[in-house]
Amino acid sequence: MRTALRTSLAAFSAAAIALTVSALPRSAGAQTLNDPTIVAIFDAANTWDMETGALAVKRAKTHDVHEFAEMLVRDHKAVRQQGRDLAKKLGVTPTPPANFGMAKDHAAAMAKLSKLTGAAFDKAFLAHEVAYHKAVLDAVTTTLLPALQNVEVKDLVTKVGPAFQAHMIKAQSLLDSYPTK
């Protein structure tokens, strides 16, 4: 049951992000995927991982998961601020996409994680982080970077890619080595 919940939460998180982001430019009548929209998505992605990280700081059972969660909050806070500073410098007003379904998806993931405690929480959180970072990296590579027009915004998104990759790898490593008892 716990493995099924962890797997379904991770799959839900990844699918929600991938579907919402990949559908943006193709939907009939959808808002154009432009720099202000991408800046809003970038900001939201960092904010949401800060929120899941903050939940894990409070609920993590193991020291390693707690430290990982603190790192997520710290790293994503810094990256979010870099994005906000750049948007301000460029005079870009972040404009979330119409029907920003990812916000509802994040709320649902947080609600599911909030119901868990102990090892079940740790494992579900780590699985979520693997899926979340993979989905964000896939969306950045296939949808967001190709649509970005501003070189400075593109450079920032490209620059933080390795940190997102490192978070995904660390979460997977912690999940793979999580004590079975």
Tell where the protein language model's regions lie, with residue ranges.
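His/Met- and acidic-residue-enriched segments that coordinate or traffic transition-metal cofactors
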Residues: 3-10, 19-181
